[in-house]
């Protein structure tokens, strides 16, 4: 039986994972950590877990990683809003532990990223813009998924990523990200390739959080026999 520790257990993603875990055989939620806990509780939390699924806040990541290293606990990180210093921590931890990070764990969003990469090879001279839409209460902007998509495309085309263009003209070597917040929209990401004569748009819409939670649980199971490295969901889906 795979013992999964769930960090952020009282958040929306945590609650969805708790609802979906019974759909999977040979794994269970063995430990929980949430905002009511003290950071030192992460010690026993990691000790009692084979792998941790983390949907909490960036502020606890360093402590979580330290205790995971202490107890050799594998990590699946889905927390968004991470900064460069957090990614350095993940890269360092991945030298000792198998670590999987993804801003979006649904197969649809990762397929969108793959398709965007393939389209970019063909539409090399098209302008690229990303529009992401989420519910009114989402804290981070742009979304982690939008940044993931932009980085995928930018790396292939040698573009700079622009979050807030304001009133300046669009430069030739950039990809822009625009954000909408409102209503109870779960997640919509659109990538537009804009040419002089036509526009091609790739779109993914999540109707609920189920696809994210299922992806996270699959990631925890998949990670069990993997060597130390930093993985993504595209390693699981082989895309």
Curated annotation (Swiss-Prot):
The active site is at residues 134, 138. It is found in: Cytoplasm. It is an enzyme of class 1 (oxidoreductase). It holds the Pfam family DapB_C. Pathway: Amino-acid biosynthesis; L-lysine biosynthesis via DAP pathway; (S)-tetrahydrodipicolinate from L-aspartate: step 4/4. (S)-2,3,4,5-tetrahydrodipicolinate binds at residues 135, 144-145. GO terms for cellular component: cytosol. InterPro entries: DapB_C, DapB_N, DapB_N_CS, DHDPR_bac, NAD(P)-bd_dom_sf. This is 4-hydroxy-tetrahydrodipicolinate reductase.
């Amino acid at each position: 039986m795979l013992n999964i520790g769930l960090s952020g257990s009282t958040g929306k993603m945590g609650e969805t994972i708790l609802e979906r875990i019974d759909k999977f055989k040979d794994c269970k939620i063995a430990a929980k950590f949430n905002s009511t806990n003290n950071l030192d509780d992460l010690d026993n939390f990691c000790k009692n877990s084979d792998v941790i699924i983390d949907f909490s806040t960036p502020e606890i990541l360093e402590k979580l990683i330290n205790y995971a290293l202490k107890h050799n606990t594998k990590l699946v990180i889905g927390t968004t809003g991470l900064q460069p210093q957090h990614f350095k921590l993940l890269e360092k931890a991945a030298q000792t532990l198998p670590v999987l990070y993804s801003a979006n764990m649904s197969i649809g969003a990762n397929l969108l990223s793959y398709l965007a990469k393939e389209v970019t090879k063909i539409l090399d001279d098209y302008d690229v813009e990303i529009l992401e839409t989420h519910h009114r209460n989402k804290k981070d902007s742009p979304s982690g998924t939008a940044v993931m998509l932009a980085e995928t495309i930018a790396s292939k085309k040698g573009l700079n990523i622009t979050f807030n263009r304001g009133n300046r003209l669009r430069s030739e070597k950039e990809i822009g990200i625009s954000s909408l917040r409102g209503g109870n929209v779960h997640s919509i990401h659109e990538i537009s390739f804009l040419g002089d004569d036509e526009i091609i748009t790739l779109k993914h819409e999540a109707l609920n959080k189920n696809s994210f939670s299922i992806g996270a649980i699959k990631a925890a199971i998949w990670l069990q026999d993997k060597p130390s490295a930093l993985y993504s969901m595209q390693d699981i889906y082989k895309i």
